[in-house]
């Protein structure tokens, strides 16, 4: 979700939008958008 696995930038922007410092695609086949815990 949120751009993963193909568009990690979309995931990063989603995380920024919820006041995290960013995010990345993680999990099985990188299909999960994971936000950094800051």
UniProtKB/Swiss-Prot annotation:
GO biological process, alphabetically ordered: defense response to bacterium
Keywords: Antibiotic, Antimicrobial, Defensin, Disulfide bond, Secreted
Intracellular or extracellular location(s): Secreted
Disulfide bonds: 4-25, 11-33, 15-35
Domain of life: Eukaryota
Chief localisation class: secreted
Pfam families (alphabetical): Defensin_2
SUPFAM superfamilies, alphabetized: Scorpion toxin-like (SSF57095)
Cellular component, GO annotation: extracellular region
UniProt cross-references to PROSITE patterns, sorted A to Z: INVERT_DEFENSINS
Family recorded in the similarity comment: Belongs to the invertebrate defensin family. Type 2 subfamily.
Role according to the record: Dual-function peptide with antimicrobial and potassium channel-blocking activities. Shows inhibitory activity against Gram-positive bacteria such as M.luteus, S.aureus, B.subtilis, and M.luteus as well as methicillin-resistant S.aureus (MIC=0.1-20 uM). Does not act on bacteria by disrupting membranes. Also moderately inhibits Kv1.1/KCNA1, Kv1.2/KCNA2, and Kv1.3/KCNA3 potassium channels. Inhibits potassium channels by interacting with the pore region. Does not show hemolytic activity.
Protein name in UniProt: 4 kDa defensin
Organism from which the protein derives: Leiurus hebraeus (Hebrew deathstalker scorpion)
